[in-house]
């Protein structure tokens, strides 16, 4: 006879893990606009420079660039939400959340040492989120299809999902924010099908949830988080090839997916290319060395 109470506890633990991993995929860097419009509007802008800084782990420089963008575009919610992304990304780096093996190995992830979050950073992060949401909702009141506003709300929810799951370990709250971010991302894709960066919001989530056991996939699907392992990889590949701000991050997530799929060669190819593109990011050489030493 099945011990239903024990089964419920086991499935609850798996769902909590899925909540955390799903939050990770919403990630930190998500200004999605049409690729050709981005090239015309923001090439070499402070916003571009800021995200390059984040990929190079230059958080101080990135924050200066984001602040400069916000000063010149005070009504644009992308400014404050990018600042929030920079703050959270720096905290993740300090806490060790950005290590790829945590995605690959649940035991390593859940067994990592706990570090106290920075309360001052937390307050600044929430203030930037609140400011971005206020600006975004004001723009959506004027134009329900405003792409920058939809992006800002998507990223606000995604960042809060990440903080709740990975720092506060509030997994149910993280699932709530994850669903909000996915819904905003889908709405953006409806009005802008070639906003390729938006595919990352759902791509890694579909891949991770598609890798879970059937009962967990079923429960999460009821909660609005679909599972499609191969479709998720396809979405990531499109963002990696045709995205703008998120193309490098899609390559990072693809390399993680390849590690999980035991495709070491393709994972190393992506990580080596990322290391060449962002030489100041110490994560890439560490992960390259780890993969090479494992075989």
Please report, for each region that a protein language model flagged, where it lies by residue:
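Short coil/linker segments at helix-helix boundaries
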Residues: 37-46, 53-66, 75, 86-145, ...
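Bacterial N-terminal signal peptides that target proteins for export
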Residues: 8-21
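Sec/Tat signal peptide C-region and signal peptidase I cleavage site
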Residues: 31-35
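A cross-kingdom marker for long, charged
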Residues: 256-295
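Intrinsic-disorder-associated, low-complexity terminal segments enriched in Asp/Asn/His/Tyr and depleted
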Residues: 3-4
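N-terminal carbohydrate-binding/catalytic regions of secreted carbohydrate-active enzymes
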Residues: 82
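Bacterial N-terminal signal peptides
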Residues: 19-30
